[in-house]
């Protein structure tokens, strides 16, 4: 584990409960994977956009802000999460908070490109991360204004490795956090197909079966990295229990993606 990861993990582990230790360790593994990919793809702008951060302490870009001199935009649509994030991220970043713009806005297909233009991002950024437990697929599909070098996006392992499906687009969709319904997001296969259409290569997933990693095709070719097949890399979300009755019920509402 690198010195930089240890630095941020110390801040995160402060005042943490025992029940959250495993979650935090999985977060640190994900951060290490991000650094590994950046090492091979290279860094050009040190700019990022992250959509969906909860309280900001375990999102994908705070470490880049804290320890590597990056700057960018974090967006959180949930008002409660946003207010917590303002406090947590300031504790983590200190003076480096000046390099972050934090927005409280509910992202939709209609407003996403306007948000990006309004915040004056160049078309090429190093990293885009999407984790909103809902319209992730539809937001990535709608983005036209930027061409990130790397995309990290949440997939729903509940839908399995073979089904290419998403939830139906609803601009007001909010995941039922309390009951943890499996109806949210998109399958890994659906995201793989979308990535191909947008000229991105699926290169891997994290060990928790939550996040998929994509690299822009022109960069993947430069480092001789071939796209992975879903069947070879698919992993289940280890923290979510499976209820076959729930699964069968939710599957009836899914939208197949070709």
Where are these regions (language model features)?
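Residue-level detector of short, conserved catalytic/binding motifs and their immediate flanks
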Residues: 62, 70, 149, 210-212
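A structural signal for short, well-ordered beta-strand segments and their strand-loop junctions
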Residues: 50, 74, 129, 150-154, ...
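SAM cofactor-binding core of SAM-dependent methyltransferases
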Residues: 22-118, 130
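Rossmann-like AdoMet/SAM-dependent catalytic core
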Residues: 3-42, 49, 115, 162-258
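Active-site segment flanking the S-adenosylmethionine/decSAM binding pocket
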Residues: 47-55, 101-174
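Short, structured coil segments at secondary-structure junctions
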Residues: 67-68, 146-147, 198
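Short, solvent-exposed loop/turn segments at secondary-structure junctions
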Residues: 41, 54-56, 78-81, 108, ...
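A short acidic (Asp/Glu
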Residues: 58-62, 84-85, 138-142, 163-164, ...
């Amino acid at each position: 584990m690198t010195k930089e990861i240890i630095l941020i993990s110390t801040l995160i582990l402060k005042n943490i409960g025992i029940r959250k230790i495993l979650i935090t360790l999985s977060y640190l593994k994900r951060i290490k994977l991000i650094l590994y990919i950046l090492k091979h793809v290279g860094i050009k702008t040190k700019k990022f956009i992250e959509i969906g951060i909860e309280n900001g302490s375990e999102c994908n870009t705070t470490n880049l802000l804290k320890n590597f001199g990056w700057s960018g935009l974090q967006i959180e649509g949930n008002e409660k999460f946003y207010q917590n994030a303002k406090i947590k991220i300031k504790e983590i970043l200190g003076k480096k908070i000046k390099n972050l713009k934090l927005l409280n806005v509910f992202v939709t297909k209609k407003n996403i490109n306007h948000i990006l233009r309004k915040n004056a991002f160049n078309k090429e950024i190093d990293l885009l991360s999407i984790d909103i437990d809902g319209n992730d697929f539809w937001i990535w599909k709608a983005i036209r204004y930027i061409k990130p070098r790397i995309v990290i996006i949440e997939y729903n392992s509940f839908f399995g490795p073979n089904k290419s499906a998403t939830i139906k687009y609803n601009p007001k969709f909010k995941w039922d956090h309390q009951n943890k319904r499996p109806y949210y997001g998109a399958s890994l296969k659906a995201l793989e197909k979308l990535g191909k259409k947008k000229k991105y290569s699926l290169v891997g997933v994290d060990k928790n079966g939550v996040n998929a990693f994509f690299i822009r095709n022109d960069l993947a070719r430069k480092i001789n990295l071939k796209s992975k097949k879903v069947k070879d890399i698919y992993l289940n979300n280890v923290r979510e229990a499976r209820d076959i009755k729930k699964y069968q019920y939710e599957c009836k509402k899914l939208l197949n993606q070709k």
